[in-house]
Amino acid sequence: MTVYNINLGIGWASSGVEYAQAYRSTIFKNTGIKAKFVFMDMFLQDNLSDLARNMGFSDEDIIWLYSYFTDLKIAPTTYTVKDLEKEIPYDITRREINGKVVKLFCAKEDIFYAAYLRKEGEDIVHRVEKVSRGCLIRKDFYSYTKMFTEYYTPVDNKAHLYQRRFFNEDGSVAYDEIVDGKDSVFRFPDKILSSKQEFIAYFMSQLGLTDQDIVILDRATGTGQAVFRNTKPAKLGVVVHAEHFSENAVTDKTILWNNFYEYQFSNADKVDFFITATERQRSIMLDQFNKYTPFKPHIVTIPVGSVDKLREPEGERKPFSIITASRLANEKHVDWLAKAVVKAKESLPQVNFDIYGTGAEEAKLKAIIEENQAQDYIHLKGHQDLTEVYKDYELYLSGSKSEGFGLTLLELSLIHI
């Protein structure tokens, strides 16, 4: 038996969905159940191995849709600038280093290569852009070998992506993706798939699912139909990660489902089980399905996280210390918290605020800190394991107006902040 967990993407600032998957992965490992975590998105900025390891997954746990049809393994990047230099067929006349970007110039050919490093100061290259006569013509993406290449042509003075080519370990071509804006055609040696939906359907059909396997759908946007149609004879489960309906739109005769679950709920007769995080949500869903639909779904409760033990500070908590931990995303409103602490500083000069997490709002928070000259008492701490960190603080702040489950708040409840 294998449990396949279907998701879209994963990032450095992952959501509760990925944390729930990571918790589930730990449970599967502890109980000896074979599980795979499938990611359907294209990853261009980072190596999936790095992102997954950051969440606690092992490389062998991961299946990436786009590499499944190659013989490449999920693995960290080991390709270096020196490796790149050996492969460039021209004389390198100049080198420039600017942060995470190393540029190698070939003056005679009017070509330069921009190597994007995994981390500043390292020699590990994630991708390389080739620019000829001022025009981007190619991007190569690496792990322990070249994974795939993007090809570009200039259109209206902009680089236009028209093709991706995916490689095997020996450099042979596994398949091509022909790109036309948001549409793609996938070309294999023995078949052509005319959309990503067909690509996903083909992938599902190649898993060799049996009646002993389970497919758990964590996110369904753009994938739901293909997964639903190609899961049998395996069992299909759907995870409800958030509030599943709009309370303000409920009447005696109608209900407005959360759009992320509408397809799954409308096809509930094809779902073997739904998973909620709490018994309360399970009870509400059962009542609503009974009232508004002809379906009688099987719904089980599996929490998306747990706390293994009570943790108390070994000494005194840091005086006037404040902590928050979340994705640095707009809906978390960490900027409100930073501004509130700046205001509190006026009457409480000893206050100290540590912000844990990463995300799109990081630059905005840095600007707030700098504008208020708050560098001495507001600190961005990045993504860290906070298991033994929470207990040292006196106060936890949250600016989020809604939570699907609130893993952080669960952790805090046993630390007595």
Residue ranges and their predicted role:
Residues 364-383:
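Nucleotide-activated donor-binding/catalytic signature segment of Leloir-type glycosyltransferases, i.e.
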Residues 203-209, 243, 252-274:
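Membrane-proximal helix-turn-helix segments that form the acceptor-binding/catalytic region
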Residues 406-409:
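Short glycine/serine-rich donor-binding loops of glycosyltransferases
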Residues 320, 324-343, 360-366:
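A conserved mid-protein helix/loop that constitutes part of the nucleotide-sugar donor-binding site
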Residues 415-417:
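Conserved small/polar residues in nucleotide/adenosyl-binding loops
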Residues 261, 268-297:
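A short, active-site helix/loop in glycosyltransferases that binds the activated sugar's phosphate group
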Residues 401:
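Aromatic "clamp/platform" in nucleotide-sugar-dependent glycosyltransferases that forms part
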